């Protein structure tokens, strides 16, 4: 329900901005409607395709090995743990995979709750205790339960639409003279510059939302396995070497992430200290 309300609110915001721009610029409504349709199609197409292909693309990008029949005790434990957590969260069993990497990380992805993936690095399995790894798995299961992959796709689509539409509307105003003639060269250059600038701002918004969802996934893990296990997992991450930021959409749903300075505005994860503090402040889970 919250995801639907968010989507409706963002679409209302698009229409509100659309009408303001028409009023300020004097651009004909039919021209603006055509551009808005183009921006929406272009803005959402890439995000939706990425979502639909996210599971297979993720497995390919990390060379992940899906666990169908456990070959050892670790794989058996992984399947049993994810199955138990998914059952408690009211979810179908996700696909579980392991990928070889020294980086201590895990991620969740997939277009729907019925077609989701939880992948874990060998580095995480080697570096963490079972309790800590259990908390990380619960964090990823919480991402799936909350539908974060779909929510991020909708948000990215709306942001893409805003960037394309506003950039081209403003470029049209600047590139059009008093006689109504538009210089295509000036229009193209200005629209490209504005799309770059607004694209950076849109990335900051998307990453802010991703960091917000990380706090929620941490809380979801605490609800599933107890907050002390999740705190222990995050503290373990603090003691390890600086992790590598995952690429693309995987970064938003991994357990780990980099930090630092102004660059933190573009990171998918909050600082570990803030995540630990937020967990300690979960009064309703003090007994766990």
From Swiss-Prot:
GO cellular component, one term: plasma membrane
Cellular compartment(s): Cell inner membrane
Cofactor binding note: Binds 1 zinc ion per subunit.
Record field: transmembrane: 4-24, 33-53, 146-166, 186-206
Principal subcellular localization: membrane
Binding locations of Zn(2+): 139, 143, 214
Span of the signal peptide: none
Cofactor: Zn(2+)
GO process annotations (BP): proteolysis
EC number: 3.4.24.-
GO MF term list: metalloendopeptidase activity; zinc ion binding
Keywords: Cell inner membrane, Cell membrane, Hydrolase, Membrane, Metal-binding, Metalloprotease, Protease, Transmembrane, Transmembrane helix, Zinc
Family: Belongs to the peptidase M48B family.
Record-linked PANTHER family: PROTEASE HTPX
NCBIfam families: PRK05457.1 (NF003965)
UniProt-recorded name of the protein: Protease HtpX
Organism, scientific name: Histophilus somni (strain 2336) (Haemophilus somnus)
Gene expressing this chain: htpX
